[in-house]
């Protein structure tokens, strides 16, 4: 299957006549870890090269793009898509993701489709699913009108987002991340958190555990155990705040984001309209600027040198000035 045309969405490809470079067994799949045929290319005007991250087999199983790993039908992250499908179908449609490498390879080699991809990858089940979603939306519309709804579609739900929160909150397994770069993909955030807590099996399988909203410059993560959340907090840099509530600093490549605890983690807080997400993005940028003006991040102290000595070279003695006159030789 790797020898076939790669499965890449229009947003990543941008041009059907784009020139690609193909490397057989050029990388390991981010999901099954098996070697696969790597494709990389540079879209017109893009600042960097785009490459495939997962193999064709794993992408087909989940009905996702090999580059951005978003659902090909809905352009949503897999976890969010499966959650929506589960709500509409009334059954558990989550994609099984094994933590064991051998099980991941077994799932990849078994073939078939997983989770919500069983419905979104085929046109007939997708039409039926969309019909159910329209029926649910039509039934919910009168109730929304009865409650008055939002008078201002551009209102930003600031009270639902903990921009003024702190990093260390007892018994919190969820965190709010703001200052997210619009070009940061979800998989890269997941990888960065996995490296910090030193395990890829940190997500809560019982709910949506990772949400990245690049348009709102925010994200949310939820750990499955409190011990993992504490390990995450312990390995972050800290940013002291003026009010005495320190925040965390998460660095991915050259990007820097701020982290606070968010016990009330929920999807609706990220906004429902374009005006709301734009307002949240402005608020995130403003808060990042205010945080930077208030304090600079404190990094872990560097290890002391042996015997507590200062690791500085002794200053070399200054050279003397010009030499005096040479002594006269008497013959």
Swiss-Prot record:
Molecular-function GO term, any one: pre-mRNA binding
Region entry Disordered, spans: 288-331
Keywords: mRNA processing, mRNA splicing, Nucleus, RNA-binding, Spliceosome
Subcellular location: Nucleus
Domain of life: Eukaryota
Bias kind Basic residues: ranges: 310-325
Biased composition (Low complexity): 293-309
GO BP terms: mRNA splicing, via spliceosome
GO cellular component: Prp19 complex; U2-type catalytic step 1 spliceosome; U2-type catalytic step 2 spliceosome
Family per record: Belongs to the SLT11 family.
Subunit structure: Associated with the spliceosome.
Function of the molecule: Involved in pre-mRNA splicing. Facilitates the cooperative formation of U2/U6 helix II in association with stem II in the spliceosome. Binds to RNA.
Descriptive protein name: Pre-mRNA-splicing factor SLT11
Organism: Eremothecium gossypii (strain ATCC 10895 / CBS 109.51 / FGSC 9923 / NRRL Y-1056)
Taxonomic path: Eukaryota, Fungi, Dikarya, Ascomycota, Saccharomycotina
Gene: SLT11
């Amino acid at each position: 299957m790797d020898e076939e045309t790669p499965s890449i969405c229009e947003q990543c490809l941008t041009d059907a006549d784009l020139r690609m470079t193909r490397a057989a067994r050029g990388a390991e799949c981010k999901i099954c870890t098996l070697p696969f045929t790597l494709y990389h290319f540079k879209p017109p005007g893009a600042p960097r090269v785009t490459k495939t991250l997962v193999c064709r087999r794993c992408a087909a199983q989940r009905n996702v793009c090999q580059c951005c790993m978003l659902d090909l039908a809905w352009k949503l992250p897999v976890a969010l898509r499966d959650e929506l499908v589960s709500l509409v179908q009334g059954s558990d449609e989550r994609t099984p993701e094994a933590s064991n490498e051998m099980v991941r390879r077994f799932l990849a080699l078994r073939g078939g489709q997983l989770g919500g991809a069983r419905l979104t990858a085929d046109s007939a089940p997708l039409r039926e699913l969309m019909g159910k979603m329209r029926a649910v939306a039509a039934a919910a519309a009168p109730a929304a009108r009865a409650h008055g709804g939002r008078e201002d579609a551009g209102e930003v739900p600031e009270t639902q987002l903990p921009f003024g929160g702190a990093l260390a909150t007892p018994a919190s397994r969820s965190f709010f991340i703001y200052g997210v770069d619009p070009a940061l993909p979800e998989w890269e955030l997941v990888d960065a958190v996995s490296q910090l807590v030193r395990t890829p099996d940190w997500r809560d399988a019982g709910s949506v555990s990772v949400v990245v909203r690049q348009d709102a410059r925010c994200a949310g993560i939820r750990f499955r155990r409190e011990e993992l959340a504490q390990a995450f907090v312990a390995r972050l840099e800290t940013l002291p705040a003026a009010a005495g509530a320190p925040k965390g600093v998460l660095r991915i490549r050259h990007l820097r984001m701020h982290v606070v605890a968010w016990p009330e983690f929920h999807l609706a807080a990220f906004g429902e309209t374009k005006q709301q997400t734009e307002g949240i993005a402005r608020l995130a940028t403003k808060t990042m600027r205010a945080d930077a003006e208030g304090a600079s991040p404190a990094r872990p102290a560097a290890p002391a040198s042996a015997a507590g000595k200062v690791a500085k070279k002794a200053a070399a003695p200054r050279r003397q000035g010009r030499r005096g006159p040479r002594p006269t030789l008497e013959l």
